Amino acid sequence: MLDIKKKINFANVSGEKTDESSSSSAQQSSEQQQAAQPLAPQQTTPTAKATNPFITPMTESTPGMSESWVELAPSRTSLCSSVDINMVIIDEKDKDSRLSPVSIAQSPHVEFESLEQVKYKLVREMLPPGKNTDWMWDWSSRPENTPPKTIRMVQYGSNLTTPPNSPEPEMSQYMPYESDSLFNVRVVFGFLVTNIFSFVVGAAVGFAVCRKIIKHHRHY
C-alpha cells in the first residue's frame, strides 16, 4: 500500500512540474512575439486648450480637483452654426407666410382665384345682411368706360382729328369763338325785346291804376 501511495504522489508532483514548465514556456513565447512586433506610434489627440485659446484648465485654480476643461467664451464655429440655424428658421417662417391662403376679416382661410372674388367678398361683408349685392358685383366687375382715341372737334366749320398721343383738348376748342361786344346782333335783339316787353307791362299797369282812380272820384 505504501508503494502505491508513493507512486501516486510522484505522478502528481511530476504532472504539476510539467504544467508549470508548459505555462512558463507559453509566457516566454508570447513575450518574444511582443518584442518582435514594432511599436505602434501613439496617437496624440489635440487638447481643448490647443483648439480654443479661451479655455482654461480647472487645475490651475483648484489643484485638488481632477483636470478638466471649461469653455469661457463660445467659439466662432458655434456662433456661426447658431446664426445659420436661426436664418433657416426665419426663411421657413417667411415661406410659410407667403404660401398661406388669404384671410379676410378673421374669417377661416379660403383661397381666392382672382382679385374679383376678394372684392366681392369684401363688399358682401361690409354691407348689412338681407340686402341684394348683385348690383354691386355687376357694377364693380364691369369694364371702365374709356374715351375714344380720336376726338372730332368742330372749329370754324371744319372737322379736325387729334393725333393719338396728343393731350386732351379744352372745352373752348369744341365751340366756335364769338366776340362778346355790345353791338353784337344777339345783344341788340335781346335788348330791344326786353324793352318792348317792359313798356307793354308798364302801360297796362298804369292804365288799370288810372281807371280805378277815375271811378273813385266819380262816386264822390
UniProtKB/Swiss-Prot annotation:
Extent of Low complexity compositional bias: 21-48
Transmembrane segments: 187-207
The record's account of how the chain is modified after translation: Ubiquitinated and degraded by the proteasome.
Biological processes per GO annotation: apoptotic process; determination of adult lifespan; mitochondrial outer membrane permeabilization; positive regulation of apoptotic process; regulation of cell cycle; regulation of programmed cell death
Entry keywords, A to Z: Apoptosis, Membrane, Mitochondrion, Transmembrane, Transmembrane helix, Ubl conjugation
Topological category with respect to the lipid bilayer: Single-pass membrane protein
Domain of life: Eukaryota
Ranges for region Disordered: 1-66
Function as written in the Swiss-Prot or TrEMBL entry: Initiates apoptosis in a BH3-independent mechanism possibly by recruiting ced-3 to mitochondria and other cytoplasmic membranes. Has a role in lifespan and tumor growth.
Protein's recorded name: BNIP3 homolog
UniProt source species: Caenorhabditis briggsae
Gene: dct-1
